[in-house]
């Protein structure tokens, strides 16, 4: 097992660096720009620098500017040179290495960018044509005493980006915000372009294409579909290391050597662990055991069927095409046959008649395995006269509301609406896009859950493979469990999930909260609020603790799956106070869960043909940080979708000063997270995020689009978002 990082050693321990002072005389915007692209050294904390450079003895603070082009046109009042021993301070040494790496690539005309966690993102030209340039991005990050003794360089292939060859000033229709530009060798948001950038470049900065401006510049966004993520990522990182990093020029200009050549770091055996085999087992409707819902759910049905039958009805547009798709979908779900019973209006001419004949032949040739009832192990009830049609997108909400207010619906019955829509979930038209959310909200206000099906998917020859996904989601929405975990972690744990979602065009992020009350993955309550609305979150947590105690007794542990790395001190105190008010004394653990991305440090298994580790593997990265792999590979070199691992940071949530966690506690928590990853019922395809985070994130994604920006009461006890 290796990680995408290579060991380096410094050739020059002592280096001469430029440091600056006197930025207080600059404008506020210049001060902010300078501070953002420098590290600050101060008296008291960083006395080693004052001891090495007597010239700065009268300064209280100095700055080392390691992103130099970003501060072009900004000149602090004072400039000093100091001899710096790289062994004296890791923080400054890392900045010096970063500066040297950025200089090396920019000297070779490669744009560089600091990403949101401080890594160097290098943009390498991949393709050029008359109108655009495509870049392949790579990230580089120096670390000290992480995966080896001493220094290492993490190297990863990132995403692609496309840049227009036409400068911004020549495209009058471009907005003032919402995209980044290449400015010299920098990547800068357009809204942060200042006069100093115009002066330095003569106004020649070029827009980076994103979905918001793609139509304006007439260039498609970059999209590279990868079917072999792990092997291709490792190969790309190796090629980049060989061609650009492990070279004489890099060694000389950055001042490093590679003691192990161009080899990535091998992980010691004690860092690589595996969850117990029994933790991988799932259970289905006939109590059959298995590990892969994609292969097994269709044959064995749900672990827990919905207790009460639901009545189904359709919502579609009022036109012939929609009626045609409605009848087709009804027959697919009810009889596993894709035909329409001649539901079209009469043909208008011979050409139309011939077209419909061919279309019927194509439809009838489609294979559908079995009706939805055989997946659900429960026959759906279709009640005549319940289906609703609407005239247009503009009148849809009013017409559906009027229909729901009719006497056809009864409060003692449970309903599920099947919405057939021609609006894709990524539709760029804002009004059409919002209709999707408003329909969901309206139905919940009347206590009705819903399943949305994109009309064009019904035409797909692979629609047969959509049906198990629809069935799994319906089971969850109707209160059942599509599958469960066979072997549960012992103990009476209360598990809380808090996820966040920040979306383009919505200023403040929203939190979604899910309170899981048993280890099978059953939820009792959802909610969503703005990220700064801590009162609502605290109130929900307190109610949930009391409900948990009433149903299951006092918890042995409170485990919070959280979108942040750790609780603030005041957040810990508030939770501890709540537990005391409920007369509960139990440990609190916080698990930060993040999906590893292309650019992260991840582990590769060289014994697997595609380099992806087996499901259940977890890697101890550092401190309390781990990588956890959940996929469908259960045998060496078995076929499976390539899913990136999740990064876990496990910390003590109490203010008791105890940070060391017991090995067995860590193992139980990681096993629990692994099992929650395997209970995702939105699809039969395995996911790599636990439902304690994935479901709250879905809730937080929907709520900002609702008319009242709050979750209807019905939606707090129902998996409506699947």
Indicate where each model-derived feature is located:
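RNA-binding accessory domains that recognize and position tRNA/RNA substrates
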Residues: 1-14
């Amino acid at each position: 097992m290796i990680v995408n990082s290579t060991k380096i050693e410094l050739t020059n321990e002592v280096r001469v660096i430029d440091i600056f002072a006197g930025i207080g005389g600059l404008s506020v915007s210049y001060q902010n720009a300078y501070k953002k692209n420098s590290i600050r050294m101060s008296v008291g904390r960083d006395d080693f620098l004052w001891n090495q450079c007597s010239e700065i003895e009268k300064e209280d603070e100095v700055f080392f500017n390691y992103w130099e082009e970003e501060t072009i046109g900004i000149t602090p009042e004072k400039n000093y040179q100091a001899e710096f021993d790289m062994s004296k301070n890791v923080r400054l040494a890392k900045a010096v290495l970063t500066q040297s790496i950025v200089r090396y690539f920019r000297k070779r005309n490669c744009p560089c960018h600091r990403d949101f966690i401080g890594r160097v993102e290098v943009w390498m030209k991949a393709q050029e044509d008359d109108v655009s340039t495509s870049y392949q991005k790579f990230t580089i990050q120096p670390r000290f005493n992480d995966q080896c003794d001493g220094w290492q360089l993490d190297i990863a292939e990132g995403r692609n980006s496309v840049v227009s060859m036409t400068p911004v000033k020549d495209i009058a229709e471009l907005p003032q915000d919402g995209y980044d530009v290449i400015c010299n060798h920098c990547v800068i948001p357009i809204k942060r372009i200042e006069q100093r950038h115009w002066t330095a470049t003569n106004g020649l900065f070029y827009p980076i294409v994103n979905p918001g401006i793609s139509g304006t510049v007439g260039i498609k966004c970059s999209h590279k579909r990868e079917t072999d993520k792990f092997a291709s990522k490792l190969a790309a990182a190796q090629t980049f290391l060989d061609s650009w990093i492990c070279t004489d020029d890099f060694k000389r200009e950055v001042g490093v050597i590679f003691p192990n050549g161009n080899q990535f770091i091998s992980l010691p055996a004690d860092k690589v662990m595996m969850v117990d085999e029994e933790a991988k087992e799932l259970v289905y409707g006939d109590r059959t055991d298995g590990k892969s819902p994609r292969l097994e759910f269709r044959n064995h049905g749900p672990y827990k069927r919905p207790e009460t039958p639901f009545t189904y009805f359709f919502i579609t547009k009022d036109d012939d095409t929609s009626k045609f798709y409605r009848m087709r979908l009804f027959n697919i779900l009810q009889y596993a046959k894709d035909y329409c019973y001649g539901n079209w209006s009469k043909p208008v001419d011979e050409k139309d008649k011939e077209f419909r004949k061919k279309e019927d032949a194509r439809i009838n040739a489609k294979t559908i395995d079995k009706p939805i009832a055989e997946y659900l192990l429960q026959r759906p009830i279709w009640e005549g006269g319940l289906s609703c049609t609407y005239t247009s997108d503009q009148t849809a909400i009013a017409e559906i509301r009027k229909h729901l207010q009719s006497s056809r619906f009864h409060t003692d019955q449970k309903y599920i609406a099947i919405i057939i829509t021609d609006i894709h979930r990524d539709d760029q038209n804002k009004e059409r896009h919002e209709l999707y959310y408003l329909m969901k909200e309206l139905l919940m206000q009347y206590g009705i859950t819903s399943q949305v099906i994109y009309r064009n998917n019904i035409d797909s020859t692979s629609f047969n493979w959509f049906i198990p996904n629809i069935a799994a989601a319906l089971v969850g929405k109707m209160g059942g469990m599509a599958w469960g975990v066979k072997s549960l972690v012992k103990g009476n744990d209360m598990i809380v999930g808090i996820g966040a979602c920040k979306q383009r065009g919505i200023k403040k992020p929203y939190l979604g909260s899910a309170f899981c009350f048993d280890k099978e993955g059953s939820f009792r309550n959802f909610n969503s609020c703005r990220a700064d609305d801590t009162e609502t979150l605290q109130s929900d947590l307190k109610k949930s603790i009391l409900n948990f105690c009433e149903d299951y007794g006092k918890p042995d542990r409170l485990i919070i799956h959280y979108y942040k790395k750790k609780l603030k001190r005041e957040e810990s105190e508030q939770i501890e106070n709540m537990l005391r008010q409920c007369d509960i004394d139990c440990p609190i653990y916080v698990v930060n869960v993040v999906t590893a991305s292309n650019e992260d440090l991840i582990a590769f298994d060289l014994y697997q043909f595609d380099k992806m580790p087996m499901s259940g593997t977890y890697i101890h990265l550092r401190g309390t940080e781990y990588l956890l792999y959940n996929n469908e590979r259960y045998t060496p070199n078995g076929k499976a979708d390539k899913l990136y691992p999740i990064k876990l940071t496990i910390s003590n949530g109490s203010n008791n000063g105890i940070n060391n966690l017991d090995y067995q506690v860590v193992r139980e928590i990681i096993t629990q997270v692994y099992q929650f990853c395997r209970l995702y019922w939105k699809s039969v395809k395995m996911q790599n995020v636990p439902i304690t985070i994935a479901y709250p994130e879905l809730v937080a994604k929907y709520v900002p689009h609702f008319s009242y920006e709050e979750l209807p009461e019905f939606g707090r006890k129902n998996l409506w978002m699947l």
